[in-house]
């Protein structure tokens, strides 16, 4: 990725998430509840739930919290009922932004998302206004220095679609979302532990941001990320390291 370091961006993202662990847990609990409600409470037959539970354990969430969230999802414990809503919009210079939320009050959520956009130089779009610029994929990112040939062989055998070496030396493995659990297990069995592993919306092309525009765009993304109902924020903005 010319002009910016994907590896540095990922490390920044991980550090920011670690700094907001309380919020991370809240997001994961919502994801576990919704995954269990939609696909049942058995992680062996519910790939989405299995991924959410793995993320929860990676974030050091206690097993009791995980089990309670699963029970709420399948109806065994009273609790708020969340629905998933996606919003699309534009950031600085028309950069594409997707905001995935889980909410028990869609009126509150849309107002908060719209306010975050408008206050920070962006604006809400309509359904489908920017999502066509992204691909829904499973993504794994490995540190610079990872054995590329061995990783590529293991990834392609596991069913990955593509293996990409970035300019900074980091390596990305991409796969269909439904194959994500299978590919993840196969890579780990081959001795490869990704620094980042997620099902994501990957931009087809990225727009480079530097200087003041980069600061403004990051401020908008942070404002959206900090909303309680927001689960994920995706953008095609590549914000250069200062």
Curated annotation (Swiss-Prot):
Disulphide linkage map: none
Subcellular location: Cytoplasm
GO molecular function, one term: DNA binding
Keyword Transcription: yes
GO biological process: regulation of DNA-templated transcription
Pfam families per record: TACO1_YebC_N, Transcrip_reg
Keywords: Cytoplasm, DNA-binding, Transcription, Transcription regulation
Example of a GO cellular component annotation carried by this entry: cytosol
Family recorded in the similarity comment: Belongs to the TACO1 family.
Protein name from the UniProt record: Probable transcriptional regulatory protein Bphyt_1301
């Amino acid at each position: 990725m010319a002009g910016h370091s994907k590896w540095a961006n990922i490390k920044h993202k991980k550090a920011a998430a670690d700094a907001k662990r309380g919020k991370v847990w809240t997001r994961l609990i919502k994801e576990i509840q919704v995954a269990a409600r939609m696909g049942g409470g058995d992680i062996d037959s519910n790939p989405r739930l299995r991924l959410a539970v793995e993320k929860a354990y990676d974030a050091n969430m206690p097993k009791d919290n995980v089990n309670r969230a699963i029970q709420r999802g399948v109806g065994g414990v009273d609790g708020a009922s969340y629905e998933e809503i996606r919003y699309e919009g534009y950031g600085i210079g028309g950069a594409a932004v997707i905001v995935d939320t889980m909410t028990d009050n869609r009126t509150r959520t849309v107002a908060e998302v719209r306010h975050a956009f408008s206050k920070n130089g962006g604006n809400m779009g309509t359904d489908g206004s920017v999502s066509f610029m992204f691909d829904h994929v499973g993504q794994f990112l490995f540190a610079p220095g990872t054995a590329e040939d061995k990783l590529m062989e293991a990834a392609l055998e596991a069913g990955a679609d593509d293996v990409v070496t970035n300019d900074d030396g980091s390596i990305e493995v991409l796969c269909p979302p439904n194959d994500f659990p299978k590919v993840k297990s196969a890579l780990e069995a081959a001795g490869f532990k990704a620094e980042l592993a997620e099902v994501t919306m990957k931009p087809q092309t990225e727009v480079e941001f530097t200087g003041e525009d980069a600061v403004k765009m990051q401020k908008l993304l942070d404002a959206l990320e900090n909303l309680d109902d927001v689960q994920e924020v995706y953008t095609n903005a590549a914000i250069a390291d200062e």
